[in-house]
Every structure is written in C-alpha cells, then in structure tokens.
UniProtKB/Swiss-Prot annotation:
Residues at which Zn(2+) 1 binds: 265, 342, 344
EC number in record: 3.4.11.-
Keywords: Aminopeptidase, Hydrolase, Manganese, Metal-binding, Protease, Zinc
InterPro entries: Leucine_aapep/pepB, NPEPL1_N, Peptidase_M17_C
Protein name per its UniProtKB record: Probable aminopeptidase NPEPL1
Similarity field: Belongs to the peptidase M17 family.
Chain's gene name: Npepl1
BP GO terms, sorted: proteolysis
Gene source species: Mus musculus
Amino acid sequence: MASVGLQFQASAGDADPQSRPLLLLGQLQHLHRVPWSHVRGKLQPRVTEELWQAALATLNPNPTDSCPLYLNCATVAALPSRVSRHNSPSAAHFITRLVRTCLPPGTHRCILMVCEQTEVFASACALARAFPLFTHRSGASRRAEKRTVMVEFFLVGQDNGPVEVSTLQCLTNATEGVRLAARIVDTPCNEMNTDIFLEEIIQVGKELGITPTIIRDEQLKTKGFGGIYGVGKAALHPPALAILSHTPDGATQTIAWVGKGIVYDTGGLSIKGKTTMPGMKRDCGGAAAVLGAFRAAIKQGFKDNLHAVFCLAENAVGPNATRPDDIHLLYSGKTVEINNTDAEGRLVLADGVSYACKDLGADIIVDMATLTGAQGIATGKYHAAVLTNSAEWEAACVKAGRKCGDLVHPLVYCPELHFSEFTSAVADMKNSVADRDNSPSSCAGLFIASHIGFDWPGVWVHLDIAAPVHAGERATGFGVALLLALFGRASEDPLLNLVSPLDCEVDAQEGDNMGRDSKRRRLV
C-alpha cells in the first residue's frame, strides 16, 4: 500500500465500482442509517438496492464482519457495535484492520466512512495508518501511476450535515502528520540517521517558516548535555538536540513536547541479542510523533507557545562508547552512574526536559518515547502508558486517547516508593533500576522527572509508546493524534477543539496536594 495518496473530500462523487472500487465502512447500526439514495451512484449499475439491503442483513460483526457486494470491486464492512470503556468509541484499531483486509485493489479507490461527528478525527487517523509511505519493494518503484484513495464521511447522529471544509483540512494535516511519523519510524538507520532526521526537522521548519535551533556533537558536551552526548558519541553520525519553536502573539502559556529520537539502539556495550535488536530502528518513534504533531498543530493554528524538542542519537558500539560504570553530568546538573547502556532513552530525555524547563520556561512538558519493553507488559500493544504528576492530566490523557484512537492507560505514580531503585553510592543516581520486577516502566519515567524535580510546580506528562508505535512490521504513527487531541483546546481548529479532553473529572483527594500552581488545569 505504499505511495498511496489519501484525499478527504466532502463528496467523492459517483462512479461505477468496476472503475473505482469502493469500501463502505461503519458500525452496523450506522450503516443501516445510510439511505440508498446516497450510495446508489457509487454502486450502480453493479449493485441494486435489494442486494445492498441483503448484504446489510447478513452482517454479524463479532467483533467485525464484511460482505462483498460486487466481485472484488465493492465491499461493505461492519465495525464492532459496542466497545469497552478502555477502547475508543470509534473502534479505530478495527478500522485500520478492515481497510487493510477489505479495501478492494485498484489505482483509484474510494472509502465511504459512516460515523458520528465525534468519531471523524479518530476514524481518519485510523484510515491513514493503513497506507504507509515507506517501501523499498522493487515493484513499487516501477509503478508509473500513483494510486489514490478518496475518503468521504457520511455523518449520522445529531451533527449529520456535510463535513465542513475546515474539517477536511484538519484531517488532511493530521493524517499527513501520522504518515510522516510512520515513514520516519519505518525507515532504517542507514537512511534515517541523525543527520537525515535533522533534515526532516529542517524541512518541516521551512514549511512552517521556523528556523530550528540545533546543538550537536561537541557543542552538546560543551554546553553540558551529558546525557545526549554520552549516548550518541560513539556513532558515525553525531548526536543532536533540535528545537522547533512557535511563539505567537497573545500566548498565555508555554508548552514543550520532548521526543526521544534514538535512530538505532544496539543497546550500546550492554548490547542487545540477535532476536531483540531487529526493529530498533523504531526507537525514534517519540521524536517522529512530536514532529508530525507539531507540523499539524501549527498548520491548524496554535494559540500558545509550543516548542518541539528532539533528542537525537544513535546508541552505537565503538571505541568511544559509554561504558557501564561511567558517570555522566546531565544538563540538570545531576550526575548519573551508568549501570546499563541499554537504558539510554531516559538519558537523552532527561537532558531534553531539563532544557525545556530551564531554557524554554515551559509550564507544561510532555515527553514521548519508546522507552521500555515493560510498557507492553504493563498496558499492552494498543495502549500507551502515561505517567504524570497530575491526576487531572492523567485523566485527560486517557480521555484524549479514547477520542482520537491513540489509546492510553495510567502507570503508578509514586516516586517516594520507586525512585530508590536508582540509588548510587558514587553519583546522584544510576540509570537503571535495581529490581526489574518493581514497576520498571514507572521507574523509567520517574528517572526523567527527577531531572526537573518532583517538586516542580508545572505539569509533567510522560508517554511510553514502545508497543503501540508499531503493529506487526509496520509503524503506526502513534502519538500524533494523541498530542493533537490532548492540546486541542489550544488550537484554533474546531475539530481539534471537539476532541479535546475538556472537563476531566478526578478525585480531588487523589490529585495535586504538593502545592501546584493553577497553570496545570488550563487545557483540560
């Protein structure tokens, strides 16, 4: 499905399915609400109204189902009729699966997505995941004509009018962000090294009229970024810290998105085995998601100061590699004894969040990373893990995930019990836990938080996306939709406002009893 152009249109028009194959997709109760007059022009002369009604009658989703309408040129597919409380009402993961398996082949195709207005954003992002951009298959390079898929939404429920032009533009930018992130993650390190990743950042900056700040190689050492420098100094392509900054007039707060961009993770001298190293090109998934989300957020209009911070390095093996027992001085001013060079992501992120706090003056810091293998055990393949110093923002992340399809579930936040795992006799802390059975994903996040301080009055959110960053052999672009939804209230776009997790309810006794300031509640 490479090299597919994805187009969102208010109306895809009518066409014989033999010349333009068609997939009709939605929950069964929604499909029954589509009048024949709306689909007739997309199905005739191959499919009659009687056949259409008969196909709907045969569908029995458990959890999904599909029925061919005409050869392999037209198909109707049903999503789950109900989802559990920890899933998205859009059933986003099933949308991606059904598109991959049920969309008829062809050069120019059409998808009619039937859903409610509140599910449009999540559905569009799920559709985008089915069409990855990166491929080196020789057949794709020989294909002369670019394939296109037109997507039309038919809205049911209260807001069942036509999709507005502003919504289509938002969907275009959001899905381009998802596919950009997935392309970067899918690209192997011999083509997506730190230099090339910087070119991606520079290109996005040029598109937005922003010149990035770049600190790299020996400059990192000179300026005190011991975490990023220590992780990446053994690689042929040097490490870098890059920042894209959007500072509009009238901004009332400063937000920083910090992404882990390990373009390849061998594990360093604590080297990974032959079965665990393949796939480590995906260790830049956090930075890729931040880049895709930043591009879409600024294009849709962002009202507050927004900084995208990219912590780029390759964790390589070489004569200059960091050794276990080495001690690094990080940008926070704290020293770290290295007891595991394969726990490198937290080192680069520690420098990134420290920079966001000290130099950017951020009120809200979100770091996103493929940080721990234990995340997949803790919250599974579909739900990212969230760790935060705010009960309200924890609830907001979960709610945003359900609204956008990038699902999230909380980790235990208890630094007074867990941070002792990093105790060192010779430095401020070690970089890896003493007991790997004691909530290691939470501990990894707490390591990052310690470099801005557990008593920091702002909002800190850590998102571990190690498992959902890919599905099988393909990247998902996970995190782009989540960031756009989580900060939807800061956007000028009505659709992002709609998916923003407003008015999250939390138990006041569970929340912020450490003297936080009021800024932490301004977006949710």
